[in-house]
Amino acid sequence: MPTAIKTHSPEHTSYDVVIIGGAMLGSSVAWFLSSNPDFTGSILVVEKDPAYEFCSTAHTNSCVRQQFSTEINIRISQFTIDFVKNFRDYMGGSPDVPDLTLQSFGYLYLADNDSFADELRARQKVQERCGAGTKILTPEELKADYGFYNLDDIVLCSLNTENEGYFEGSTIFEWWRRSAGKQGAEYIANEVISMTKSANGQKIETVTLATGDVISCGTVINATGPRAALTARMAGIDIPVEPRKRYTFIFAAERPLD
């Protein structure tokens, strides 16, 4: 049930918030903002690929883990897990909203040297303080439960099978996008090609679209994912974001797994 996306020019020439990028990140911001009773402003979402064919959202595995080295990343993941498990409640409780589950297949990190092993131990302590179920295992301990691994060159293992795994990210994205539209966020198929800043250089005052429209704005949100650095440069900002390939490998076991 896709939301109809307006093409080309927006309805107005001024918005409180302009979100550049309408995929998972942009639609998340649009939904959370439009759902917040304290926010009464206008929202414009500018998406240059309205079919979402080339965005990272369309290619993600939609997986979540808690095995990070910083508390903020762990807490963000834990909020994500709670959101997935209680998706219907977060979206208003309607029976039309699907119930989602988290398929906790777990994440396993293997250290083949003492330096990385020490890093895994340090990370586990942070994760444990945050309530994550990460366990540090010797190769022998891991082998006892997962006998199909060849661990000859491994010195330490970090494993968490609780609240780490896959969820239906595409469903969340579609409901965010559609609900944000119903709550007043305006989606258009267009592209931001430049920005102008205030006299003191501290604020973006307008964005110019590929159609030539110049839009005044209170706040601009960069939600362009791997293209975020290119978008930021329009505002004279350099950020360390770049697209990188990620690979998923699916193995067929030579012998049936126990």
Where are these regions (language model features)?
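Helical element adjacent to the flavin cofactor pocket in flavoenzyme catalytic cores
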Residues: L159-T219, R227
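Extreme N-terminal leader/targeting segments of oxidoreductases
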Residues: M1-V17, F32-S42
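Glycine-rich FAD pyrophosphate-binding loop
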Residues: S34-T57
